[in-house]
Amino acid sequence: MAQASKGPKSTSYDAYFENVQSRKMLPQSLQETLTAAFARIPVSSFPEVPGGKVIEIPADTSIGDAVRVLSESNIMSAPVRNPDIEYTTDWRERYLGIIDYAAIVLWVLETAGVAAAALSTGSAAAAGVGAGAAGTLGAIALGATGPAAIAGLTVAAVGAAVAGGLSAEKGMAKDAPTAADKLGEDFYKVILQEEPFKSTTVKSILKSYRWAPFIPVATDSSMLSVLLLLSKYRLRNVPVIETGNSSIRNFITQSAVIHGLERCKGRDWFDCISANPISKLGLPFMTPDEVVSVQSDELILEAFKKMKDNQIGGLPVVEGPKKQIVGSVSIRDIRFLLLKPELFSSFRVLTVKDFMNTIASAIPHTGKVIRPLTCKPDETLGSVIHALASNSVHRIYVVGDDNGVTGVITLRDVISCFIFEPPNFFDNYFGFAAQEMLGC
């Protein structure tokens, strides 16, 4: 029987991994031995999420309630469950995808932008923007301070609420990055009462703001399958389904794997690979021309648009023709836009540089823009892993002697250094259903 032709996503996955394998200058025997070892380790051996229970969000949950769940559970993302299916052994029927906090806040900003545009042209009805959205978010996005803004949420209320409310404001007095990482307890208290939040469900934005499919593995699956999904197949997290049951038992993220690798320091196989300079491993797996960056004088919304369009989580902020790095922004930094009401009211004209400076001014003792995480081509993979794990970040930028950005190393890239895909592993292990969901 003829083999089905591969789709564009499959070709992209293959091209990435083939590039990785061709650039790694490691003994083939070492790679085969290590890959075989990962293939024998069951997923059930990986540490469980804190508390031992994976938090799930029903698809008919409102955006406000979803944020409340994420906030109270201190997590950034959660599987979305189909509330219409109570009892089933088929995970395809039970789960619809994964929602994360950054996607929700991105939706908030885009909703505000649409409402503001509608208000500025007097065409809210024609644009299909509800009275709540236009009167509240739109007025705030335009910087209104009169009755229109007061009739909805006040500027201060939205700024504080979306940023994380009192928790974030208290955190700002200590450390701004920490504040941005705390979801805050008051966000949901405000948006539960306002449109379009209280009538918009998680299901309605799940498809448009989902960057990766929902592909679980079984508890008796191998860690190799998880590592391949998190690297070659570009997933950021992999749900673990209990065998014979559709319930999720664990939730393995790229970050968790990197922290796991960091704890392997001292083991022969890890030290053998991590002692190599990143250049010997072919890192970064891109050319300087392929780096997606943003100039410091561009609008901050353009930076977030580039992230969404390219499905990447962060960008280096550069200046000049040599692209000298002066900072970085990530999709999670959207929350910083909302830490201060004056930022939110002017976000449509705010430059990346002003955005970074405003954040820096709120950080005690320094008052300076936080230096982005960088490395040189001669640094070891071990030092890169340590930097990523200890700073809890998702990427590190490779720079030359002139501090110009020459590449980016992501968690996906690091995981790819330790494995390769055995022949026909994907076809034999995951089967057609997973191929279809991955878009292969």
Annotate each predicted stretch with a short phrase.
Residues 1-440:
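Tandem CBS (Cystathionine beta-synthase) repeat/Bateman regulatory domains
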